[in-house]
Amino acid sequence: MKCLWCGEEVERAEPILSFLLGANRKCICVYCEHPFMELRQHPTCLECGRLMTKVEVCPDCQKWHQVKEAVLLKNTALYAYDEAGRKFMELFKFVGDTRVMTVVIKELRQELLKYQKRGFVLCPLPSSKASLRKREFETIPTLLEQCHVPAVSLLEHIGSGKKQSEKTRQERLQLKQPFKVKENVGVPKKVLLVDDVYTTGATIHLAAKALTEIGVEEVESLTLFR
């Protein structure tokens, strides 16, 4: 079997090891198991998790302070959205190769459990109907399922038009609400929104606004990349 990341041959694991690590573990060779820059080892923005030269609030977040829709308390990102991050998103989200999830599951699960211990209900950010028709699977719920952590689907996507990945930065910043809270759902006190990439922050801020409007008191977010 060839490594999904580098294309080199992957040594076959012993049967008991394959069972313990999961069937997909050996799709990635030992040299490619940790391909990303971990942001926790570097100075980042206090609010969005962006890579910085020193720990402070970045210019983008300072602008969000002036926007009434900005009710998100904080975003935590695991990895920098660099070449390796873009490669992961291409394989996972656009090619649809879910086996590549193995390079993020361990760290993602650890971070999710920390939020659960703090009383946060995990809520995946839903994909648009157009994206679902193309991919045929929900990326974030699929990740959460593999992490074996409970999550609640509180939101549905009601937006139309271009996918986020196809929009310009200016288009993403045009704040038109693409989410609504599902009917007959309980109102948690604290919600953690989970998404793949934080770019301008517009999508997550609007999701947070939809939740606070029904009475959620605290909304934070966790993304794979920033």
Set out the residue ranges of the language-model regions.
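Glycine-rich phosphate/pyrophosphate-handling loop used in enzymes and phosphotransfer proteins
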Residues: M1-R226
